[in-house]
């Protein structure tokens, strides 16, 4: 007898072993038809996996987040089924679930085209209509190897070789197609009807550019058509907001092959950059940070002592001169310790907060570069706090509060916080990691805010809290971090004199709020579709004449606005005023001032907004107050976005 406890506390008894599907059938045929998988004592299992002992069971349906993820994972297998039917010579690699969808990496001698993707999607739909069952078989290792050898699936064999301790594997049979997976998967293809293949890209085996190139096909899948339609609309909107397109249209920046991963900032884009830097400089000054500047090229001996040379060398640009090896700094932290080490510090000097707008370079793979979002040369709003163990919790708590306030200024209110713990490749003792992880967890707990763990995702020198923003399209961007690091100060001989007049190694907190200026500007561009809040707009005001007679008056107004600290330009072209207004609206300039004879005579301006609102006639002084009020609101007042 097997006793099954359901979420409502009721108990059902079964003679002998049972399955999630049988439990669902005992409740009702409707639930059984909707069953995708189940949770047995908290663990996800396939609908037909045997339950051999008393257990707590939850039925998973497409209405559950887990159910949608299972549908997506099964769609990846369905994609494999379709691809192998159409192109038998290709070799399947991996097909995981990702945010909002899935992908499959495939090795093919022939490059895939959009026509190939359309054919694959069509075949997937045909297979779904066959309404076949997906069969799971736990298969001994030797038999699994034989199956994939016979099918010529070299990459599956390599994956098996990576798991020497596994004596058996789960094989999922989609008719004649077989794939290897831990599961769970849907019991039948009828659950996979709501999907769409979305794009293709290149990838490398094991993510290493030295290995063979693969072709990656992306897709999305949902529980119902309405969710799919909403997602497709969101993707289309994201394409309109692509920061590379908007950056070109608004003359913000460009990239070119002669400097891969490096940004050529134009005047408009550099203005946004400078506004961010000036804002962050004041934030840091107001919160007790001292700003420093350190070298960009440093001898390898420092990077060896810090641990970067052994743990991060492949991502560092190096050079040599006069028989010495140097690295262009990928991070600022070792250099900040050098500043701390100049002069003996007392416990009375702590916490010591050092900030730098540090220019860093990392040798990212060329295939991963993506506009401002993934670059090789970037600037961080970087800072390091040297403190005692007893000061960690308060410093982290203060940083959390500061970070959330900064994000609110940029219009981001939906913030996700996660604690990334020790990775396999790391420096320092387990005891130091235990202490550091607990310090961050305690600070998060005491903040009263929701947070989650990210196991194994910490930096090699310490755990960290990651702050992720959810933008206006619901996308999540990881930006800020704070990391507890007891290791680097010790490696680089940092010390202070404690209250007992003894030498002690300080704790080092690595922290950034924006992350990199480049990436954060890219996020802002896409979040606002280029319609920046007034305080961030490259040009806040354009002054336009109706005829040549008002040209001088326009220039006088521009000068008055500039003296008040506003970013203003004039448009004195001999064009119709309607044409000029339309053009400057497309340039996303927040305010347009029109001067005709009446305005010149009265010393006033006619004010229009980029949203098309006519604010009427007012004095220049009144207009300046209007703009200063909008600037003070920062990103708390979201601009109306017009995609026309």
From Swiss-Prot:
Quaternary structure (record): Homodimer.
Domain TGS: 1-61
Xref: HAMAP family: Thr_tRNA_synth (MF_00184)
Catalytic activity: tRNA(Thr) + L-threonine + ATP = L-threonyl-tRNA(Thr) + AMP + diphosphate + H(+)
InterPro entries associated with the record: aa-tRNA-synt_IIb, aa-tRNA-synth_II, aa-tRNA-synth_II/BPL/LPL, Anticodon-bd, Anticodon-bd_dom_sf, Beta-grasp_dom_sf, TGS, TGS-like
Species in which this protein is naturally found: Psychrobacter arcticus (strain DSM 17307 / VKM B-2377 / 273-4)
Keywords: Aminoacyl-tRNA synthetase, ATP-binding, Cytoplasm, Ligase, Metal-binding, Nucleotide-binding, Protein biosynthesis, RNA-binding, tRNA-binding, Zinc
Source species, domain of life: Bacteria
Gene Ontology MF: a single term: tRNA binding
Major enzyme class: ligase
This protein's name: Threonine--tRNA ligase
EC number: 6.1.1.3
Lineage: Bacteria, Pseudomonadati, Pseudomonadota, Gammaproteobacteria, Moraxellales
Record-listed Zn(2+) binding positions: 333, 384, 510
Described function: Catalyzes the attachment of threonine to tRNA(Thr) in a two-step reaction: L-threonine is first activated by ATP to form Thr-AMP and then transferred to the acceptor end of tRNA(Thr). Also edits incorrectly charged L-seryl-tRNA(Thr).
One example of a Gene Ontology biological process annotation: threonyl-tRNA aminoacylation
Gene: thrS
Subcellular location: Cytoplasm
SMART domains, A to Z: tRNA_SAD (SM00863)
Family membership noted in the UniProt record: Belongs to the class-II aminoacyl-tRNA synthetase family.
A UniProt-annotated Pfam family: TGS
One cellular component term from this protein's GO annotations in UniProt: cytosol
Region of interest (Catalytic), residue spans: 242-533
UniProt xrefs under CDD domains: TGS_ThrRS, ThrRS_anticodon, ThrRS_core
Cofactor(s) needed by this chain: Zn(2+)
């Amino acid at each position: 007898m097997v006793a099954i406890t359901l979420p409502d506390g009721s108990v059902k008894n079964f003679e002998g072993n049972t399955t999630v599907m049988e439990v669902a059938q005992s409740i009702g045929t409707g639930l059984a038809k909707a069953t995708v998988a189940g949770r047995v004592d908290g663990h996800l299992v396939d609908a037909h996996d045997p339950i051999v002992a008393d257990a707590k069971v939850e039925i998973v349906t497409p209405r559950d987040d887990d159910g949608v993820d299972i549908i997506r994972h099964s769609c990846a297998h369905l994609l494999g089924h379709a691809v192998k039917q159409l192109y038998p010579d290709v070799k399947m690699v991996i097909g995981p679930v990702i945010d909002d969808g899935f992908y499959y990496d495939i090795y093919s001698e022939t490059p895939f085209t959009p026509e190939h993707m359309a054919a694959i999607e069509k075949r997937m739909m045909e297979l779904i209509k066959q309404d076949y069952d997906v069969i799971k078989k736990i298969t001994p290792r030797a038999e699994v190897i034989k199956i994939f050898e016979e099918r010529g699936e070299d990459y599956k064999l390599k994956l098996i070789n990576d798991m020497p301790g596994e004596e058996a594997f789960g094989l999922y049979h989609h008719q004649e197609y077989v794939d290897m997976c831990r599961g769970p998967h849907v019991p039948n293809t009828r659950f996979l009807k709501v999907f769409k293949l979305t794009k293709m890209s290149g990838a490398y085996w094991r993510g290493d550019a030295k290995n063979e190139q693969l072709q990656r096909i992306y897709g999305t899948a949902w529980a119902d058509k309405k969710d799919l339609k909403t997602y497709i609309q969101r993707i289309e909107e994201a394409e309109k907001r692509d920061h590379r397109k908007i950056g070109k249209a608004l003359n913000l920046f460009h990239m070119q092959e002669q400097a891969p991963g490096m940004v050529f900032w134009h005047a408009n884009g550099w203005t946004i950059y400078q506004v961010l830097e000036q804002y962050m400089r004041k934030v840091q000054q107001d919160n007790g940070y001292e700003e420093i500047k350190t070298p960009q090229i440093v001898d390898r001996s420092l990077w060896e002592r810090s641990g970067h040379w052994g743990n991060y060398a492949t991502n560092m640009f190096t050079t040599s001169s006069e028989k010495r090896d140097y690295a262009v700094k990928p991070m600022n932290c070792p250099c900040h310790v050098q500043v701390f080490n100049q002069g003996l510090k007392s416990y009375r000097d702590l916490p010591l907060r050092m900030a730098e707008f540090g220019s860093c370079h990392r040798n990212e793979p060329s295939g991963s570069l993506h506009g401002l979002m993934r670059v090789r040369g970037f600037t961080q709003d970087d800072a390091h706090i040297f403190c005692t163990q007893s000061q960690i919790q308060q410093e982290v708590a203060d940083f959390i509060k500061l970070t959330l306030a900064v994000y609110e200024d940029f219009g981001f209110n939906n913030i996700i916080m996660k604690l990334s713990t020790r990775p396999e490749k790391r420096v320092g003792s387990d005891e130091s990691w235990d202490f550091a992880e607990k310090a961050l967890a305690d600070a998060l707990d005491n903040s009263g805010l929701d947070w989650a763990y990210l196991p194994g995702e910490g930096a090699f020198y310490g755990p960290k809290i990651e702050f992720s923003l959810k933008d206006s399209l619901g996308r999540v961007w990881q930006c800020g971090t704070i990391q507890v690091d007891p290791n680097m100060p010790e490696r680089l001989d940092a010390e202070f004199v404690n209250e007992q007049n003894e030498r002690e190694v300080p704790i080092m907190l690595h922290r950034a709020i924006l992350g990199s200026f480049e990436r954060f500007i890219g996020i802002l561009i896409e979040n606002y579709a280029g319609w920046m809040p007034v305080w961030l707009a490259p040009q806040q005001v354009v002054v336009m004449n109706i005829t040549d007679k008002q040209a001088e008056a326009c220039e006088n107004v521009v000068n008055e606005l500039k003296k008040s600290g506003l970013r203003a330009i004039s448009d004195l072209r001999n064009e119709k005023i309607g044409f000029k207004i339309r053009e400057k609206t497309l340039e996303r300039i927040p305010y347009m001032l029109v001067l005709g004879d009446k305005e010149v005579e009265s010393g006033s301006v006619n004010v229009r907004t980029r949203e098309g609102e006519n604010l009427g006639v007012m004095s220049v002084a009144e207009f300046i107050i209007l703009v200063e009020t909008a600037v003070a609101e920062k990103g708390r007042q979201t601009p109306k976005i017009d995609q026309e």
